[in-house]
Amino acid sequence: MRSNYCTELDSGDIGKIVDVCGWVNSYRDHGGVIFIDLRDRSGLIQLVCDPKHSQEAYTIANSVRDEFVLRAHGKIRARGKDLINPKLKTGEIEVVVENLIVENPSKPLPFVIGDKNVSEETRLKYRFLDLRTNENFNKFFTRSKAAIAARNALDRLGFVEVETPILTRATPEGARDYLVPSRVYNGQFYALPQSPQLFKQLLMCSCFDKYFQIARCFRDEDLRADRQPEFTQIDIEMSFCDQKDVMKVGEAVLKDIFKSCGKDIKTPFRVMQYKDAMENYGSDKPDLRFGMKFIDVADIFEKSSNEIFANIAKDKKKNRVKAIKVEGGDLKFSKRQMQRFEEYVRKFGAQGLAFIQVKEEGLKGPLVKFFEKSEIDELVKRCELKVGDVVFFGAGKKKIVLDYMGRFRIFLANELELINPDALEFLWVVDFPMFEQNEDGTYSAMHHPFTMPNNVDEPDIEEITSIAYDVVLNGIELGGGSIRIHKEDIQEKVFKLLKIEPAEQREKFGFLLDALSFGAPPHGGIAIGFDRLMMLVTRSSSIRDVIAFPKTQRAQCLLTKAPSGISNEQLRELGLKINKKEQK
C-alpha cells in the first residue's frame, strides 16, 4: 500500500514512482491546481493534483477536507526554485498525483490539529487527535528508542528481564494502594504494586543475580505535574554488590539512553552527601546548572545585638542562618522586585526576608544596624561582597529555612535567567537519613523499610543513616535506590524502630523474612522513573505529554471517562456495596 514514509523522500528521488499515505494537513486551490500537504508520522510532503495529469485525481482532491485519510500514487518532481520551502524536509520536491484514494473521510474536527491554544482538557478528551502531530509522535518515538537502549544496555551487562506480578498484596510503601476486589475470595483484595520492590528482592534470594524490568507501577496519591497514578520505571536489582556497583550500572543505562536520543553525557556523575545538599542548596535534589550556594553565617549572627537573631543562631541543632549572594543584584533588582521576593518566601513559612545591599557609600539594609563594624567586615569577607552585590538572609527553624531558601535560590536563578536549558547536570545524592519524623511525632522510613542502615544500633533514631542514593538531573529526581537489608535480624530491628510489632511483621512480611533467613545474598538496586526521564529528554512541561493516554490531576481519563461505575450484578459478584460519600 505504501512505498515510503513522506520524509524518506528527497531530491535524490526525483522521477521515482511512489505511493504515500497519510492525513490531509492542509489543502489549497491555486488556479485550478489543488495542493495538499499530506502528513504521516514522519512529517509532510506536498501532493499536486493537476487535471492535466489526472482529471480523476483532481476531482477527488476537490472533495477532501482536513484530516481525510488519503493514499496517493504518483511521481516525484522538483519544485520550482521560487516554490522551495526550506522549512520542510521535503521542501524541494512534490508528488504529482496520478491516482488518489480517500481511505476514510473525517468529520469536522473539535479543534485544529497542532493548535497550541487548545485547552489540555479538550486535548485529553480527544487524545487520539492530539497525538496526530509530528511533535507528539516524535516524543513517543524518542521514548521507544530510549526503552530499547535501556534493554540493550542491561542485556549487555548480563541482566535478566523478569516480569513480576501486577496483582499482589498490600504492603506499606508510603502511598495508598489501588485495591482490586477478588471475586473468588469474597471480602479479600489484591493491590496493584507501587513498585516490584519485594519481588525483585526475592529474585535475588533465588540466585537470579541480575534482574531488570520496565515495570508498571501504581500509586493512589495526590498528583502533581510530574506524577501519575500509573507510571513506568526502569527497575534494576543485583546481588553481591555495593553502592558504587549499582551507581555504575545506573550511569551506564542513562548514558546509553541519552546516546539513543542524540546526547552525550559524561560519567561518572558527581556525588554529594544528603547533608551537604540540604545545607548548601536547601534541597535533596539540587540543581547544579548555576551557583548561588548557601553561605552559613550563623556564627556571625550569634554576635548580633539583636537578641532574636542571636538566639536563633545559637541553637545550631534546631535552627539555621543562611545567606544567598547575588553578584550585581543591587544594580538589577528594583524596590518592587525586592518586595516580591519577600512575598514569595513568606508563602513557604518565612517570617520575612532580610538583606544587605553593597553601595559605593557602604552597606545598606535593615540588618546593618544590628552588627558592630568588625562583624560587618567579617560578613563582607565571608560572603566576598563587592559594590553592587546584594545578599539575602534566612533565619529560623532548620527545616523551614532550608526549604524556603532552597526555593528562593531557584526563583532567583529564573529571575536572572541563569539556568542554561541545554545543560545536563547529573548528581548522586547519598547517605540519606534512614528515618524521617512525621507531623504526629512518629517516624517512617525516608525511602522504604527494606533499605540497609549504616548504624542501626545508634540510640538517636534521627542519626541513623542509610545506604541509599538518588540520581538527580537538573534539580529533578530521576530515580532512587539502596543497598537492601539481607539479614533477618536487621530487618526485624528496622521494623521494631518503625513500631511494627512482631505479629504484624509476620502477617505482612513473613514471606520476606523467611527468604532472608534462607541464605539471602547482599543485594541492592535502583529504579529510574522513565516517564519523568522522558519528560526531561523531550523538554516537555509535564509527564502527561510523554504518556500516550494519561490521567488528569484528578486521576481521571477524559477519553474513556475512567474511573466509571459498575453494574449491580458485578457488585453482587464481588460482595460489595457502595456507600456514597457526602459531597463536601
Swiss-Prot record:
Query: Biological process (GO) annotations?
Result: aspartyl-tRNA aminoacylation
The GO molecular function terms of this record are:
aspartate-tRNA ligase activity; aspartate-tRNA(Asn) ligase activity; ATP binding; nucleic acid binding
Output a single Gene Ontology CC term carried by this record: cytoplasm
Keyword Aminoacyl-tRNA synthetase assigned: yes
Q: Where along this sequence does the record place binding of L-aspartate?
A: E173, R219, H447, R484
Give the binding site residues for ATP.
R219, D220, E221, Q228, E477, G529, F530, D531, R532
Annotated Pfam families: GAD, tRNA-synt_2, tRNA_anti-codon
Give the protein's recorded name.
Aspartate--tRNA(Asp/Asn) ligase
Name of the gene this protein is made from = aspS
